[in-house]
Amino acid sequence: GTKTHWRPDLEVFTDIKIENEYFEDVLKKQAVVNPNITFILRIQRENNSFEEKTFYYENGIADYVAEIAGEKPLTSVQFFTGDRKGRDREDKDDYKVKLSVAFTFSNQVKCLEYYHNSSFLEHGGSPEDAVKSAFTSQINAYLKSNNKYLKNEKPITFQDIEDCLVLVSSSFSTQTSYANQTKKAITNKFIKECMTEFLKHNLETVSYTHLRAHET
């Protein structure tokens, strides 16, 4: 493997005291989106001994969703993955996209996390828009087709759904458009469109027994 040693220049980095929790959070997120890879954090104490923590998710986001949901999720964890190719505009070149989504429902916890090219998207962007559109559309269609709505009842909204949804998505693309320089949201039109189609298709074909288990 590769070993990298780096010492910050104190003239540039005037404050180099970074809490251990920051490194733990970063490595955990990397383990989540890089399945079957072990990340080890070693923190040197004042007595020169080392405190060591290991981060590992054999099945990546699927195991992470199961961890968040705990022992009593309302449904089993669903995992979808696929590849797409397209472009954001007619005058642009095609690029490749790899999509992975894991989710379950819970009445104990809710969580929505989006990652792209191994980076956590704090503000979501295209993947978040796709999840909102696809889940609202498909669950609404299921409720209508099975006569689950009461007379004059308003259609379900994503706010209703997210209250019991535990979902993590991880996507990769050969071209990425970020909302701004902080890179906490992506704006690729094609990623939004293909991920919406990808989710709708998989939600439509997945066994509806999982959704029935969510009904109360």
What are these regions (language model features)?
Residues 21, 28-30, 36-183:
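GHKL/Histidine-kinase-like ATPase module
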Residues 3, 19-23:
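Domain-wide signal for the mature, well-folded portions of proteins, strongly enriched
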Residues 192-208:
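Long, non-coiled-coil amphipathic alpha-helical linker/lever segments
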Residues 1-7, 13:
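GHKL (Bergerat-fold) ATPase N-terminal catalytic module, capturing the glycine-rich phosphate-binding loop
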Residues 10-16, 120-121:
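Short, polar/charged loop or turn motifs at beta-strand boundaries
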Residues 6-7, 18, 41-42:
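P-loop/Walker A nucleotide phosphate-binding surfaces of NTP-dependent enzymes
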Residues 181-196:
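Short, exposed interaction patches on small structured surface elements
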Residues 209-216:
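Conserved small/polar residues in nucleotide/adenosyl-binding loops
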